[in-house]
């Protein structure tokens, strides 16, 4: 069945890290880990992610997740970074992509208000025949603003 809507709503971002027991058994996993340590990828990913979550909070009005022990993927599989809302986690995406990476969670789609906004048909793109949720455009704008902020800070 479907889950009930929830009142909580947060944004956060994940960067490479938080390897757990058994996750470095294979040579390719150890190589990916070494590549992260020997490059600026981790520092750049953390910095980019900080700008992205700040832009999400500003543009979307979604608060930044600081920490929640009830969220097992944070408690058991993530590490906090010094930047609010940025967590290190060993996801396949964060492990195998080389370079600067921000895996963002822009909002909780289970949030009652967000679910309605994500289902609204209140935006159109030139040349596209169907109406789309404006909230998707707003999320894209937040990523764009965060990326520009990070680039301008370099």
Explain the meaning of each model-derived region:
Residues 25-32, 46, 133-142:
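Short C-terminal domain-edge/linker segments immediately following a structured domain
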Residues 2-40, 114-127:
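A short, glycine/acidic-enriched catalytic loop
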Residues 34-43, 146-151:
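Noncatalytic linker/hinge segments flanking ATPase motor cores
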Residues 10-11, 45-53, 140, 144:
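Extracytoplasmic/secreted envelope proteins and their assembly/folding machinery
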């Amino acid at each position: 069945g479907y889950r009930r809507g929830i009142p909580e709503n947060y944004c956060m971002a994940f960067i490479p890290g938080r390897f757990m027991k058994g996750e470095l058994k294979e040579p390719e996993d150890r190589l990916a880990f070494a590549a992260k340590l020997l490059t600026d990828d981790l520092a750049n990913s953390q910095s980019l992610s900080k700008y992205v979550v700040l832009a999400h909070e500003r543009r979307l009005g979604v608060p930044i997740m600081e920490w929640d022990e009830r969220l097992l993927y944070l408690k058991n599989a993530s590490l906090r970074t010094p930047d609010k809302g940025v967590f290190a986690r060993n996801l396949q995406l964060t492990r195998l992509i080389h370079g600067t990476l921000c895996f963002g969670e822009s909002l909780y789609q289970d949030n009652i208000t967000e679910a309605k906004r994500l289902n609204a048909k209140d935006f159109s793109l030139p040349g596209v025949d169907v109406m789309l949720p404006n909230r998707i455009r707003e999320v894209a704008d937040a990523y764009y603003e965060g990326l520009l902020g990070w680039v301008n800070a370099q």
